[in-house]
Amino acid sequence: VAYFSPTGGTKKAAEMLATMLSQNPEYIDLTRRKFRKQKQYFGNKDLLLAAAPVYGGQLPQLKEALFTNFKGDHTPCILMSAYGNRDFDDTLAQMKDILEARGFYCIGAIAPIIPHIYSEKLGADRPNAEDEKVFRQFAVTVKQRLEDGLEESLMIPGNPKPEPKTMKPVVHYFDETKCKGCQTCVQKCPTSAIDKDTYQIKEELCVGCLRCERVCPSGARSSDYESVKKYLED
């Protein structure tokens, strides 16, 4: 199970499905840059569950693009694009394109709803018990495809190579009076966008995932995303 999950929503959904597919799933946390840099190899007896959140209808735009460090050997894979109750748009198509170019074939794809990072309303408390039922049925279908030896890759809607979108701006705030200098935000940032000396965010590297805000133990970080929230909820 390989996932990118800055605030935990995608990870939760991926773990829920993974336990229905395997008794002992192994996890690769692509939220950590070092695991996006390391080559990851998979055999034809493996099954990869690749999970990513949807950012503006696409994969997050990272310097080390997700799943590009993977190498399969005619390895079956399941795609999961987790989104905040708007739309997954091109994300699954992107994932399929990236992984099939690297030795995988897609036997299943799912787009569960998770809490939206910019809205308390959208995707609240998801995945829930009803989602779990859907996951279980999906897992049964995937296992059957594997048992039947079906190796034909699924057709996935969307544009596999969309033009990168400019994300709506998020204004970040840092309160030096609350900061304890613990460096948690620096260490946990998935794109290394926070200066370790000044704690200021390098906007050109920031993907607006809000991980720094969520992991700060002293509440020194906050952000203004009201314009994004209003756009989403209206």
Cite the ranges covered by each PLM segment.
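Short, hydrophobic/glycine-enriched beta-strand segments
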Residues: 1-5
